[in-house]
Amino acid sequence: MLITCTGCHTRNRVAPSHLADTGTCGRCKQPLPPGQGPVEIENVADFDALLASATVPVLVDFWAPWCGPCKMVAPEVAAAARTLAGRCVVAKVDTDRLPALAQRYQITGIPAFKVFRAGKPVLERTGAVHARELVHWAGGA
């Protein structure tokens, strides 16, 4: 999975089992504290590993690069990830790159959000939302 450094914006690869650990950016060597932004899911195996190892709820943003509302909501998702740090993992799934996940969870419109607990979806909603709404919604899962 990829975590973006807040200092130099380099995308750093992190194993799902280490998302709660602190690390160091491979480029600028600044600390990569856990939960500072959304985790970019690279493949189905990483997604499954994240859900299997998560000890907190996982909020997933299903999006696509061509989707205007998805682009508009991206900063809101990032803000929600910072606010929810330690209480919820926030992940992003590009439905164009990972259509199997979109099909598995019956994503028919984007942006779509699902909250998972113990590997199972417990909440879902579709459409653009503000960070405070995401925090309120996902924080109660």
Q: Model regions: which residues?
A:
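Short cysteine-rich clusters marking metal-coordination/redox-active sites
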Residues: 5-8, 25-28
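Cys/His-rich microdomains that often coordinate metals
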Residues: 12, 32, 74
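Short linker/helix segments within small regulatory modules
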Residues: 14-24
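Short Cys/His-rich micro-motifs in 6-15 aa windows
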Residues: 29-37
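A short beta-strand-turn-helix
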Residues: 40-58
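Short pre-active-site segment immediately N-terminal to redox-active cysteine/selenocysteine motifs
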Residues: 55, 62-66, 109
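Typically the conserved alpha-helix immediately C-terminal to a functionally engaged Cys/Sec
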Residues: 69-84
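Non-catalytic, surface beta->alpha helical segment in thiol-disulfide oxidoreductase systems
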Residues: 109, 114-141
